[in-house]
Amino acid sequence: MLSRTAAPTKASARTLSRAAAEQCRTFATVQDGSANPVRHYGGLKDQDRIFQNLYGRYPPDLKHAKKMGDWHKTKEILLKGHDWIIGEVKASGLRGRGGAGFPSGLKWSFMNFKDWDKDDKPRYLVVNADEGEPGTCKDREIMRKDPHKLVEGCLVAGRAMNATAAYIYIRGEFIQEAAILQNAINEAYADGLIGKNACGSGYDFDVYLHRGAGAYVCGEETSLIESLEGKPGKPRLKPPFPAAVGLFGCPSTVANVETVAVAPTICRRGGNWFAGFGRERNQGTKLFCISGHVNNPCTVEEEMSIPMRELIDKHCGGVRGGWDNLLAVIPGGSSTPILPKHICDTQLMDFDALKDSQSGLGTAALIVMDKSTDVVRAISRLSHFYRHESCGQCTPCREGSKWTEQIMKRFEKGQGREREIDMLQELTKQVEGHTICALGEAFAWPIQGLIRHFRPELEARIRKFAQENGGEALAGGWQRNARQQGKLVSPGM
């Protein structure tokens, strides 16, 4: 694994050695491995937090939203124009909060291509509220507690890309959240904040709410667009990209709920204010969802680059049974590779630091596992989830997810051979990068993380099974007395 130097205090920066930087070059966003990003950590105060009603202290209505600063000087922001808004978002260093981490200002600017104003097609902002990643619940909290942040964010982000309307595609299971968000949209219309002449700015902008039907794959932007158009939720080949041919064949941009919701605050307080938190290329604040074996599971807003251990100890009351009882953490939702305790000890929570550790920030949903966890069974359960949610369009994903689930079920019981571990690793590598959307990587990476860090556990189960059953399991999980038992179908089929 990558070598890290332990820090004497939790406020000091963790730096990679030159050798480790060279080793992780392919995983790092930072191109110069010798240059450590400047870190500005420790300055976040309660009044700096964007989502002031994250814990539901006040009703999620327009009256209380205005008291907490929402819709303040929104007209002035709109009148400054799209170039100014995009400039502030670029200056803030905001990166997509849905998992990919693409620079938001750059992504939004793609909508304002040359001669865009001569194109008579409508233009759309599509908000991805189809939050289905296991362990992730940040967008749900925004829509349930701070819906006006999202509605105002749609208006500001829509102005940045000169959109005519926003479609919020919300997960079908979010019944309460959909009702609260629709009420916030109705309040904004009634107050003249959206619709014709939004906020008195002369800019017309509509917001529509569309409920999905529960498919995880619709969290991918082109699958979401297909579903929004009334088609089966299956991803499109790119190019053309949505900024050119998106929803209903019109220029569109798909953005995450959290990404859109922070835009008005960035414009009000300034991009440089937002960039003052975290470190270079990893700026701003972020919603972290912490679940699993902690004393107080929660969703909390913290600044980027906070140490993982401090995040868990400060907001969750620590790991159940103490930090020494920690086994591993999945740091960014179920699709990111698992990290063992010795890495978590000094791990920073941002895009680059987690790439250096061969994982990812993803949705910043930490799933904490203590030493009572059956880690093989946990990853096997994720394999079942991704097999179930595969849309079946791409052969590597359709077939690969089925086979990885079957192999992981056998590994749970020790019914395998050591060479099958390498075969499983190779199978995931063959799927990775060979599918239309990222679901192929989503089911491959957790297994790769398991093999990378917990291979001895897999081997120990295989040896234990061999000792108890007179030898290793036969290929495919067949038992030696299968014929006598009348079993003619391989396990898992």
UniProtKB/Swiss-Prot annotation:
Subcellular location: Mitochondrion inner membrane
Keyword field contains Hydrolase: no
Binding site residues for NAD(+): G96, R97, G98, G99, A100, G101, F102, P103, S104, G105
Transit peptide feature, positions: 1-27
UniProt cofactor note: Binds 1 FMN.
Membrane topology, as annotated: Peripheral membrane protein
InterPro entries cross-referenced by the UniProt entry: ComplexI_51kDa_subunit, NADH-UbQ_OxRdtase_51kDa_CS, NADH-UbQ_OxRdtase_suF, Nuo51_FMN-bd, Nuo51_FMN-bd_sf, Nuop51_4Fe4S-bd, Nuop51_4Fe4S-bd_sf, SLBB_dom
The name this protein goes by in its record: NADH-ubiquinone oxidoreductase 51 kDa subunit, mitochondrial
